[in-house]
Regions:
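Histidine-centered, transition-metal-coordinating active-site segments
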Residues: 1-91, 101-432
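Aromatic-lined, polymer-binding surfaces characteristic
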Residues: 98
């Protein structure tokens, strides 16, 4: 193999060097049909309905996660605390590259519909099966069966069980670092700030007891005091991405409509042509073959939506036409102060009034995500080293607001048209 380079807007050049044997393996993995399929799966599902630039794919994100893992591994080399393991390093980079290879189309909507119709196989399970049984598995086994086994173990062990697994899956991992930078870039949002170069420079590796009262120890990444504000801003940006991008009310409307369409197809696959991959998939409930699953991508779903829009005259056809033309359900979000919750009694009364008036609606309560506090597994917290302190402190113990960022779930109701939404507003006003 000669040197290979991929131009990337986040990492500039992602390189595969002819001088590194495992880079040739990584390049072969990228060329497999299973990995190339990720070119046809959007990273953010329906976000481009609101943010037209957000058309990037899980393919580019997976390459970015691999590159981010490489950068994080250099921290281990520079600290010279942990004995280097080429096998572990290669497996870590490989796991970062392949972490999304089992993703289905349309982000998480497709998985929710699959589960509701009896296919209870999550994308993480498909990832493991692809690494085990596809061309990807063959390439890894032919190079080194130990790396194949080690790479697969990242998707089986408990998150954050050692430094290498922390790079692949944790609150500050290669996946999250890349998608936050990438999603901000392609959506164009400006809130918060992410400074991975500074955070990396402020990362230390310390051998710590599992909790302050335990004698058992593990190596962990620890943020130095100089990186405190940067890690706070990182979690602020993470929370805002969920609030303003991933859970945007308009893209959620499109998700709800797509979910209704796919649910109708799952219940009656006969409305699709004989060899439609989506029809074959839903007819193979509860356990589709791997080859059936990996035929699915966003292009298959949208071609099916086009077919339904043009070949039926029922509710599914109407929904499909509306989705194609961005004629979306209308949202009414119950008003409330930030970080507070809606009174459940009041919300229940509102829903009863809606039903009494014969109104059709969909409720949506997305859970805001932010910093997660671990009470029983202390080392999974983001730890900050404080000058003069012998043991680092968890981020939530130092920040006045980082734990509160994810509070205050939105309480939304979606209606088929503007008229119904306005009626709903009047009903809510009457009970306030």
């Amino acid at each position: 193999m000669r040197d290979q380079r991929i131009r990337d807007p986040i990492h500039d050049l992602i390189k595969f060097s002819a001088n590194r044997k495992f880079d040739e393996v990584l390049w072969k993995l990228v060329q497999t049909s299973e990995f190339q399929r990720l070119r046809r799966i959007a990273q953010l599902g329906f976000a481009e309905i609101v943010y037209p630039g957000a058309t990037h794919t899980r393919f580019s994100h997976s390459l970015g996660a691999m590159e981010m893992a490489r950068k994080m591994l250099t921290i281990l080399k520079h600290n010279q605390v942990v004995q280097e393991s080429e096998n572990d390093e290669n497996a870590t980079v490989c796991a970062a590259l392949l972490h999304d290879v089992g993703h289905g189309p349309l982000s998480h909507v497709f998985e929710e519909v699959s589960e509701s119709c009896g296919i209870k196989i999550h994308h993480e399970d498909w990832t493991k099966q692809i690494i085990e049984d596809s061309n990807i598995g063959t390439i890894l086994k032919d190079f080194d069966s130990a790396i194949h086994k080690n790479g697969l173990s990242f998707f089986e062990v408990e998150h954050g069980s050692d430094l290498y697994s922390t790079i692949v899956s944790s609150q500050f991992d290669a996946d999250r670092l890349d998608f936050m930078l990438r999603d901000r870039y392609f959506t164009g949002v400006k809130f918060g700030s992410i400074d991975p170069a500074w955070i990396f420079d402020c990362l230390q590796i310390q051998q710590l007891s599992i909790d302050p009262d335990s004698e058992a120890e593990k190596y962990r990444f620890v943020v130095s005091q100089k990186g405190f504000s940067a890690i706070e801003n990182y979690f602020y940006a993470y929370t805002e991405l969920y609030s303003k991008v991933y859970f945007h009310k308009t893209s959620r409307a499109a998700q709800i409509m797509m979910k209704q369409i796919l649910s109708a197809v799952a219940q009656d696959p006969e409305i699709l042509p004989k060899n439609n991959p989506l029809k074959v998939y839903f007819e193979s409930t509860p356990k589709p073959l791997l080859e059936t699953y990996i035929r699915l991508d966003d292009s298959i779903i949208w071609a099916t939506i086009r077919f339904l829009a043009e070949n039926n005259s029922n509710q599914v056809s109407n929904l499909s036409q509306r989705l194609l033309n961005r004629n979306l359900f209308k949202c009414f979000e119950l008003p409330k102060p930030p970080k507070e919750e809606i009174d459940p009694i009041k919300a229940g009364k509102f829903e009863r009034r809606l039903k009494e008036n014969g109104m059709k609606f969909e409720r949506d309560r997305p859970q805001r995500k932010g910093y997660k506090v671990y009470d029983t597994d202390y080392l999974k917290n983001i730890l900050v080293s404080i000058e003069g302190e012998t043991y680092p402190k968890a981020l939530d113990k130092l920040s006045n607001w980082v734990e509160d960022m994810s509070k205050g779930r939105p309480h939304r109701y979606y209606f088929e048209n503007t008229e119904d939404r306005e009626i709903a507003k009047e009903i809510y006003k009457a009970i306030s």
